[in-house]
């Protein structure tokens, strides 16, 4: 029975049916629940997501993990398939560089303005033709990013295929002076932290890492509440805790409501409130944060906690299986493909179309992430679910 199964598991089963050599990891989770360390071993990845919020978090995850990636999607009203290519470097543009304040607000980000149209996470309307065209653009750029083919990846560009007019365009993305995705996460050296640091106090951790009062702390994906107000007495406070961990009002003991959430803060502002709390109040295994000195912002350092182990389903031994790929185009580097681990975030209609195109190649590993399950209304138009249901009889 396909209905009710996680989309990530459906995608995994399809990959295994057509490819018995690749290691596969299928994860059912919301991206905000995953630390960036999970993705650190990938050579390249694709964001195949509808939600602006999920795309924003995915971009920050890949910048922190230093994973080159493609953001694929459709502009349904214009019949455009699109793909944006990012090298995950501090001085290279990503898709978020072009987002307006309204788009960031719709993504659920705190930009200091109310947004009555914040996204719910539901998919955007499109057609299968658009999805498959966007998947083709993304698959080609993924192959180029990894060096699996000799083509030059279009890093820092957005590619668009107009299905109505049959026109293909590419344009270079502008590099914003201060991208909301915080490219500083991809800058500087990486310092690996011991797991025991999660049990230390935030003050001790920041002191060990060299943070001063004027140092900026940039959190990878989690946001802390910098300003909250009591729903009863109206007293305001700066708790600097996760929204899910807000405590009661210090004045009257009633519930606090979040007013301002931040991922970048000055340590001197937060320290008086949270320095004595455990580092786990902000961080988890696999998490990361950047410290940016006030006097030398170009000398940022990323500090990373070791990630929890990812459960890979091992593929079959390669042995002499190369003969099966004798008809692969000569432009494909089969030996290199066997060394590469890739990721696909999103296994809905677009992700399914992408996985169909990538699954037959004998990658070393493929990580698939999606939070949703297959619904009855999805089966007919979800290519992988329809195939598996047909195979099941």
State the predicted function of each range.
Residues 1, 131, 135, 139, ...:
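Glycine-rich adenosine-cofactor-binding loop
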Residues 1-20, 363-393:
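Glycine-rich phosphate-binding loop and adjoining beta1-alpha1-beta2 segment
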Residues 3-6, 10, 53, 130-137, ...:
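Conserved active-site and cofactor/substrate-binding residues in soluble primary-metabolism enzymes
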Residues 4-5, 155-158, 339, 389-390:
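A glycine-biased structural micro-motif
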Residues 13, 60, 144, 356-360:
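Short, well-ordered alpha-helices that flank and scaffold nucleotide-derived cofactor binding pockets
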Residues 19-20, 24-32, 36-137, 141-150, ...:
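E1/E1-like adenylate-forming module used to activate ubiquitin-like modifiers
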Residues 36, 124, 313-342, 349:
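A short, basic/flexible loop-to-alpha-helix module at the beginning of a structural domain
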Residues 232:
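Metallocofactor- and cofactor-centric catalytic cores in central/energy metabolism, strongly enriched
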């Amino acid at each position: 029975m396909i209905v009710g199964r996680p989309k990530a598991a459906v995608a995994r089963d399809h990959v295994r049916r057509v490819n018995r050599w690749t290691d596969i990891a299928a994860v059912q989770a919301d991206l905000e629940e995953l630390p960036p360390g999970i993705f650190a071993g990938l050579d390249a990845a694709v964001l195949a997501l509808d939600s602006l919020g999920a795309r924003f978090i995915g971009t920050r995850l890949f910048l922190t993990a230093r994973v080159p990636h493609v953001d694929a999607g459709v502009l349904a009203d214009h019949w455009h398939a699109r793909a944006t290519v990012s090298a995950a470097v501090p001085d290279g543009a990503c898709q978020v560089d072009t987002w307006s304040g309204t788009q960031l607000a719709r993504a659920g980000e705190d930009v200091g303005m109310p947004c009555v149209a914040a996204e719910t996470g539901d998919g955007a309307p499109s057609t299968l033709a658009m999805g498959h065209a966007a998947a083709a653009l993304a698959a080609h750029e993924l192959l180029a990013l990894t060096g699996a083919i000799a083509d030059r990846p279009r890093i820092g560009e957005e590619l668009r295929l107009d299905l109505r007019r049959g026109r293909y365009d590419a344009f270079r993305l502008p590099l914003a002076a201060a991208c909301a995705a915080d490219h500083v996460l991809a800058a500087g050296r990486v310092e690996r932290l011991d797991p025991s640091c999660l049990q230390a106090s935030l003050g001790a951790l920041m002191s060990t890492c060299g943070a001063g009062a004027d140092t900026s702390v940039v959190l990878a994906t989690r946001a802390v509440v910098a300003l909250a107000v009591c729903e009863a007495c109206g007293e305001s406070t700066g708790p600097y805790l996760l929204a899910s961990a807000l405590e009661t009002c210090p004045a009257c003991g009633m519930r606090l409501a979040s007013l301002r959430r931040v991922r970048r803060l000055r340590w001197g502002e937060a320290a008086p409130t949270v320095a004595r709390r455990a580092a786990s109040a902000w961080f988890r295994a696999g998490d990361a944060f950047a410290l940016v000195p006030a006097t030398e912002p170009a000398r940022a350092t990323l500090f990373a906690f070791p990630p929890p182990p990812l459960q890979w389903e091992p593929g079959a031994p390669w042995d002499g299986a190369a003969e099966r790929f004798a008809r692969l185009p000569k432009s494909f580097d089969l030996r290199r493909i066997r060394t590469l681990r890739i990721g696909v975030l999103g296994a809905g209609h677009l992700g399914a179309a992408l996985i169909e195109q990538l699954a037959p190649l004998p990658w070393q590993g493929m990580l698939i992430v999606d939070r949703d399950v297959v619904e009855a209304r999805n089966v007919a138009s979800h290519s992988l679910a329809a195939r598996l249901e047909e195979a099941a009889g």
